[in-house]
């Protein structure tokens, strides 16, 4: 493991919805890449316990998807609170990236950042204030290079 200020932290949250004032984080996953996007390490993937009342705020589509992929069962059986998940994630990140050096990287990351600010503030403060949002790159590609975007979109759909 090499701590390097140029390494990037990629994060993905699953939530019961998109409003941090109502909804909760139900899963957190991270990975580390170098500056050239080579994956260096996968971080912990942690289902976060939420009670049935909190889970009831999920819309039918979310509920169906997370039931089908097993996340609801993992949430109900999880021993992790938001705080414990935050500690475990930070412990992993410290092995690879110094505090305040990596932008927050991911897809539609501003939503994740809002949830971290509310429920995992120490983790949110671990990141640099900047962010690399893949959804921004997708939107720009769609507008500037639609042929390339559509070609990549087809490849992604075929893989899944």
Curated annotation (Swiss-Prot):
Domain of life: Bacteria
A Gene Ontology molecular function term of the record: nucleic acid binding
Active site residues per record: 129
GO terms classed as biological process: DNA metabolic process
This protein's record includes keyword Hydrolase: yes
Compartment(s) where it occurs, according to its Swiss-Prot or TrEMBL record: Cytoplasm
Entry GO CC: cytoplasm
Enzyme class, broadest EC rank: hydrolase
Segments forming domain Exonuclease: 8-158
CDD domains attached to this UniProt entry: Orn
Keywords in alphabetical order: Cytoplasm, Exonuclease, Hydrolase, Nuclease
InterPro entries attached to this UniProt entry: Exonuclease_RNaseT/DNA_pol3, Oligoribonuclease, RNaseH-like_sf, RNaseH_sf
Hydrolase found in the keyword field: yes
One Pfam family hit: RNase_T
EC number: 3.1.15.-
Gene3D superfamilies: Ribonuclease H-like superfamily/Ribonuclease H
Family: Belongs to the oligoribonuclease family.
Function: 3'-to-5' exoribonuclease specific for small oligoribonucleotides.
Identification of the protein by name: Oligoribonuclease
Organism, scientific name: Buchnera aphidicola subsp. Baizongia pistaciae (strain Bp)
Name of the gene this protein is made from: orn
């Amino acid at each position: 493991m090499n701590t390097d200020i140029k390494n990037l932290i990629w994060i993905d949250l699953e939530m019961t919805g998109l409003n941090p004032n109502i909804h909760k984080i139900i899963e957190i996953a991270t990975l580390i890449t170098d500056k050239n996007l080579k994956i260096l390490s996968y971080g912990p993937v942690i289902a976060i316990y939420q009670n049935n009342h909190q889970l009831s705020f999920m819309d039918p589509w979310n509920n169906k998807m997370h039931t089908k992929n097993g996340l609801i069962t993992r949430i109900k059986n999880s021993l992790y609170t938001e705080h414990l998940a935050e500690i475990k994630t930070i412990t992993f990140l410290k092995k690879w990236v110094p505090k305040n050096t990596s932008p927050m990287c991911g897809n539609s990351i501003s939503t994740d950042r809002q949830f971290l600010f509310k429920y995992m503030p120490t983790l949110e403060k671990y990141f640099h204030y900047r962010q690399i949002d893949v959804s921004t790159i997708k939107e720009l590609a769609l507008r500037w290079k639609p042929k390339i975007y559509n070609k990549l979109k087809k490849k992604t759909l075929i893989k899944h």
